[in-house]
Structures are given as C-alpha cells and as structure tokens.
C-alpha cells in the first residue's frame, strides 16, 4: 500500500502482507499482468442493463474484488513526488516493476499485428482460472473472454460499419486456434449466449460515449462468433432491438453500430438476413445517415446468396411497395445515387416478393400496381409498373377478375395499361391471350355502359374504348386476303389449262378433258356451253337490231352539244395561244419593277433575286417549252383531223377516228396479252 511519509512529505511504497497470491503475482510478470488487465477491463463495465437484459453484475464484481483491491493498493506514485524522496536501493526494482505490469499496452496500427501479438495460451489460462473461480456462472466466463480480447486487440478506432472490409471482418482474421477456444467456450456456456450477445452490444454502445474510447474488435469478434451459429438470437427479438435503435436515433454512430451487429445474423442464412433487413433496416430507410448502410447491406446480402429460393415468402406487399416507392418516386428522402442502387436491386426483390408460385400470388399485388400507374407518374416508374401489371395478367389468371372489379374506378390507369398491352401484344404468351381477350371484351361492354351514362372521365373512357377495339382486332388476327388468293388460284388454273391444251393439241386428248370425262363433268359442261352459246347469239342479235336505232337517237340528242363544246374548246386554245405569252412577259416585267421599288434588307433582296432567277429559269425552261409543245400537238391534231375528214371536221368524222383508235388499242392489248401468255407457258414448261 502506498502511504504518505511523515518526514519528507513524499510517497513511499509499503510491501503487502506475505500472501501467496501476492508474491506469486509479483514473480509471474506475464500472468499477473494479464489477470490485472482482465480485471481492469471488467472493472470499467459499470453500465445500466436493467432494460432489456438482466446480468449477474453483483457476482461478477464480487469475484474480481480481490484483484481490484490489489490494483488500488499498488498505485504508482506521481512522478513529481519521486524526486523529493530519497529511495532505498531495493525500492526502485519494485517501483519499476509495478508500472510494467499495470500500464496499458498502446494500440497497434493494424488488427493483424494485434492478433499476432495475442498470447492464446495466456488467454486459455485466464479462461480456465475464471471457470474454476465461477464454476456455476458461465456468463462470467463469456464476459471475461470478451473483455480480455477487447483489451488486447486495441487499434485506432474505425468507422462503425467497417464498410471498407469484408463482411466477416474482423472474425476472418482470427486464427484457427483462437476460434476453437471461442467456439468451445460458447458451447460450454450455451445457455448464456443470448445474454452475452446483449452484453457485447451494450458495452460497445457505452464505449462509443467515451473519449477517446477503446476500439471494439474483441466485442465484434464475439458477436460474429455467436451469430454464425445462432442467428435467431437477433431475429427472435427484432422488436426489442428496433426499439433500442430508435432510442439512439439522434446518435448515428450508435445506430450504425447496432445495425452492423444485428446484420451479422444474415450472412450465413438468407432468411434470417431478410428478417433483419425488413425488421430493422427498412424502418429506418430514408434517414440520411443510416440509408447508405441499409442499402449496402441489402446489396451485399443478395450478392452473397444468389439462390433466392431460400428467401421466398419473406417479402410481402406490405414491405414490397414501400421499396417500390423508395426506388422510383422522385424527391424522396433517398439521394439519386441510392435510388439508382436500389433500382438495380429491384428485379431480385421482385423475385423474392412474388415467391415460388407467382401464378397464385400476383393478383394480390395487382391493385397496388394499378393504383400507382397514373399518367403523371415518372417515366421509369411507369415502365416498371406497366411491365409488372402485364406480368400479373399473363401469369396469374385471377388478376383479370381483379382488374374487372377495379376498372370503373381506375379508368386513367387502365387506359395506360390497355395502350401498353396494344403495343406489346406480340410479346404476350399465346396461352394468356385468350383470357385477356375475354377480359377486354368485358371491358368494352363496360365502356359502352359508361358512355351511355355520361359519367365523368369520358376522355379516359373513349381512350379505353379505342384501345379495347384495337386489342380485339389484334386478338382476332388479320383477315385472310381472299381476293388475292382467288386471283392467284385463277391465274394458276388458267395457266395450267393453257399449258395442258397446248401440249396435247386438243381438249379431248388433254389431261383436263380426261378428268372431265371420268368425273362426268364434260357432258354437263358441253350442255352449259351450248346454252351459253345460244344465249350469247340471241343477245348479239338483239344488240344488232336495237343498238343502231339507240345510237342514232343518242347521237341526234348529244351531237349539237358536243359540236358546241368542241367550238368553245377550240376558241379557248386559240385565245390562249395568242395572248398567254404576252401576259407571262408582262408579269415578269411587273415583278422586276416591284422588287426595284421596294426597299428591303440586303439578305431579303438576295433571296428574292434568287427566287426571281429560279422562276425565270422555270418559266423559260419548263413552262414555255411545255406550252409550245402543247400548241404544236393541238395543231398536229387539228391538221390530222382536217386530213382525215378531208377538210370538213364533223362529229361523224371524229367518231370514226375514235373508233379506229379504240380498235388499234384493242389489237395492241391483244398482242401484248398473247405475248405474255406465251412467255408464262414457256416458263411453266421449263419448270
């Protein structure tokens, strides 16, 4: 015990009584130092854990009471007092030995160095001693383990989430021997593991209040070791930990520490990880300081578990649609970069939400999808909503009945969906088209009823009705081109018949004739041909008798009008040929004078000058030559009429010339048709 000297007013070191424990502690520098370090680390854990856990703090303090008294009695005197007191020769050894035992080792730069320097044998010795002293209290063993590791593994304090390191850091750096010690002790104290987890978490939170405070690697290692085997310690008490998180909402460092600790339960099991994320991190999504870690944790969780089947059934509509709003709604509490990151994760979240049997679950998502698909929603969100609605309609048959019920109250959203279906009809599976066609037919009837009632939103009703008609037309498919098919068959039949007749020289020897005879159609055909020939002859005789009289009467009625019209047309063309050229020249001169009188900007003058040159060029190069050619053609026609009619151009003469022209045209067409048929038969015979 250190006492005040009466003579000099300084400090002197007084030896304790001769107890075996004290003498052995003085001799064994390594073991005594470790034990005092453990006692010192345990001595500072004076925090209130009355809620939510109950610990055996009284027994824990009683067990280490002797160690604490020994440390207090062996206090090192202040350095200023040492120089005032002459010290005995034996005392310096004792004074220098005590600081070497109690002085806290400085932090290592790297955790790897601290783990290499850790004496695992000394740790095992301390744990054996703790188990022998506190035989019936395994929670004290676990606390000793965490305190010892945290005391020995001191490095500069890191940010709470360890985002720059792998997900299993720092436990991944622990050696196999140390892992065996930790796992063995956790197995022995299996009944106290949950209390031990709470102890580590609350101790970490209390260390964050201290300045500068210790690094928390020892507690982190213990938390990771516990949750690797027992993640349900966290997931069975999510409400308690969420309340703890909300109570520290004003302290981001503590919140991130809690989120990191609870998140360790999900890296070995996707189901437990999703429970943690949905129960702890989704409620705080949107808080500026906590959102980056929440989304980064979800990204890492889904990346570590590419097989999403183990997470089916974890995300329901209650959790899915807030995520949809966070991902796609603009101006929410997430930054654009976090929104983009969440959008990239959204397809996998959809797979988790829809589950193993989407054909029986998607109809529960349809109403919320439809209510959000408004014309004013953002383009990216609209695209995602329409794709999801189409998936619901094509995968789950019950979605169509849900749509029919919601249709009258969601006309604007339904119009967008119908237009999207019309655009993507070719990509819809054929099995789903039939049910969609029935649904669209029902919606069309609803549209007609709404239009008759004249209710509000008639614009949306008209849009929906137009889209329904287009979809029904697409569903029925294009009409077959019957006219083209008939024409093709007719051409093929005529070609085959011509080829058959030409190759066999007669109908009797041809294949067509033999087929007609064998089928009994030839006699019937001959009778039909005879009747047609008789009727045709009668018709010709009737026309021969009546047509001249009708033609003469028609000519007598129409001839005066036609002659008058011909006279006027001839006069008009004569007038135009005499006066049009002079008017065109006059118009050109007046246009040039107009441009000279009007004062315009230089750019406009250049533009008008270019247009003038273009018009003059067009007039001289196109209009005038065309006009002269037309006049020459009319003159030639007039001269030809005078020559053909021998000077007197009458209607009878013109009629005769027109009939000759028609006859010549008909002969030309016959020649062309015969040549084409010859060519077609040649091509068919070559095949």
UniProtKB/Swiss-Prot annotation:
Return the annotated region ranges for Disordered. Answer: 1-38, 70-108
Q: Does the keyword Endoplasmic reticulum apply?
A: yes
Record-listed N-acetylalanine modification sites: 2
User: What spans are recorded as compositionally biased (Gly residues)?
Assistant: 23-32
Q: Which UniProt keywords apply?
A: Acetylation, Apoptosis, Endoplasmic reticulum, Glycoprotein, Membrane, Transmembrane, Transmembrane helix
- Spans traversing the lipid bilayer: 481-501, 614-634
Name the GO terms of the biological process aspect: apoptotic process
Q: Where does this one sit in the cell?
A: Endoplasmic reticulum membrane
Q: Which GO terms describe its cellular component?
A: cytoplasmic microtubule; cytosol; endoplasmic reticulum membrane; Golgi apparatus
Q: How does it sit in the membrane?
A: Multi-pass membrane protein
Pfam families for the chain: TMEM214
Q: Origin, by domain of life? A: Eukaryota
Positions annotated with a glycan in the UniProt record: 269, 307
InterPro entries hit by this protein: TMEM214
Q: What is its main location?
A: endoplasmic reticulum
Self-association and partners:
Constitutively interacts with CASP4; required for the localization of procaspase 4 to the ER.
Could you tell me what this protein does?
Answer: Critical mediator, in cooperation with CASP4, of endoplasmic reticulum-stress induced apoptosis. Required or the activation of CASP4 following endoplasmic reticulum stress.
Family the entry assigns: Belongs to the TMEM214 family.
Q: What is the name attached to this protein's record? A: Transmembrane protein 214
Species, as recorded: Mus musculus
């Amino acid at each position: 015990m250190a006492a005040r000297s009466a003579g000099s007013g300084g400090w002197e070191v007084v030896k304790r009584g001769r107890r075996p424990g004290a003498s052995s502690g003085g001799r064994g520098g390594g073991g005594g130092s470790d034990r005092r370090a453990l006692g010192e680390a345990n001595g500072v854990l004076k925090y209130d854990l009355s809620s939510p856990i109950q610990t055996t703090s009284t027994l824990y303090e009683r067990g280490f009471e002797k160690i604490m008294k020994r440390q207090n009695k062996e206090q090192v005197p202040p350095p200023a007092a040492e120089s005032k007191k002459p010290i005995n020769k034996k005392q310096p050894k004792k004074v220098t030995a005590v600081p070497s035992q109690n002085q806290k080792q400085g932090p290592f730069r790297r955790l790897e160095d601290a783990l290499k320097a850790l004496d695992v044998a000394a740790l095992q010795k301390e744990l054996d001693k703790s188990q022998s002293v506190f035989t019936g209290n395994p929670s004290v063993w676990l606390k000793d383990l965490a305190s010892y590791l945290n005391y020995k593994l001191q490095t500069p304090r890191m940010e709470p989430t360890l985002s720059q390191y792998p997900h299993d850091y720092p436990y991944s750096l622990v050696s196999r021997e140390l892992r065996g010690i930790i796992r063995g002790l956790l197995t022995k104290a299996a009944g106290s593991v949950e209390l031990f987890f709470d102890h580590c978490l609350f101790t970490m939170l209390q260390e964050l209040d201290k300045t500068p405070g210790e690094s928390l690697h020892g507690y982190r290692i213990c938390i990771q070791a516990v949750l690797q085997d027992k993640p349900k310690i966290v997931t069975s008490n999510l409400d308690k930990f969420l309340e703890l998180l909300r109570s520290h909402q004003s302290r981001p460092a503590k919140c991130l520490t809690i989120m990191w600790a609870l998140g360790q339960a999900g890296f070995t099991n996707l189901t437990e990880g999703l429970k943690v994320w949905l129960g702890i991190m989704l409620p705080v999504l949107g808080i500026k300081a906590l959102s980056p870690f929440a989304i980064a944790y979800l990204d890492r969780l889904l990346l570590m578990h590419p097989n999403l089947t183990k997470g089916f059934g974890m995300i329901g509509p209650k959790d899915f649609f807030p995520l949809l709003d966070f991902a796609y709604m603009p101006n929410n509490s997430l930054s654009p970069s976090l929104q983009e990151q969440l959008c990239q994760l959204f397809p996998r979240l959809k797979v988790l939400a829809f589950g193993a049997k989407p054909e029986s679950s998607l109809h529960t998502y349809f109403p919320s999808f439809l209510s959000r698909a408004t014309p004013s929603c953002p383009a990216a969100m609209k695209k995602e909503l329409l794709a999801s609605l189409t998936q619901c309609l094509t995968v789950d048959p019950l979605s169509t009945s849900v749509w029919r019920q919601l249709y009258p109250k969601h006309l604007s959203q339904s119009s967008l969906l119908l237009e999207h279906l019309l655009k993507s009809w070719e990509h819809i599976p054929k099995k789903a088209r039939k049910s969609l066609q029935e649904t669209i037919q029902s919606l069309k009837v609803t549209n007609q009823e709404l239009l008759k009632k004249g209710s509000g939103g008639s614009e949306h009703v008209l849009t929906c009705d137009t889209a329904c008609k287009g979809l029904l037309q697409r569903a029925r498919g294009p009409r077959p081109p019957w006219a083209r098919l008939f024409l093709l068959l007719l051409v093929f039949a005529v070609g085959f018949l011509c080829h058959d007749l030409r190759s066999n020289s007669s109908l009797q020897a041809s294949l067509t004739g033999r087929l007609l005879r064998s089928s009994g159609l030839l006699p019937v055909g001959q009778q039909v041909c005879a009747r047609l020939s008789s009727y045709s002859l009668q018709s010709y005789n009737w026309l021969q008798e009546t047509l001249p009289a009708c033609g003469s009467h028609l000519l007598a009625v129409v001839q005066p009008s036609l002659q008058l019209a011909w006279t006027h047309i001839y006069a008009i063309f004569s007038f135009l040929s005499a006066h049009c050229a002079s008017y065109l020249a006059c118009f050109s001169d007046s246009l040039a004078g107009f441009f000279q009188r009007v004062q315009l900007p230089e750019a406009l003058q250049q533009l008008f000058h270019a247009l003038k040159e273009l018009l003059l060029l067009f007039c001289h190069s196109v209009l005038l030559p065309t006009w002269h050619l037309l006049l020459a053609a009319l003159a030639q026609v007039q001269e030809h009429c005078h020559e053909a009619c021998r000077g007197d151009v009458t209607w009878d003469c013109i009629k005769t010339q027109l009939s000759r022209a028609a006859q010549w045209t008909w002969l030309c067409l016959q020649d062309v048709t015969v040549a084409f048929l010859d060519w077609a038969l040649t091509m068919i015979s070559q095949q």
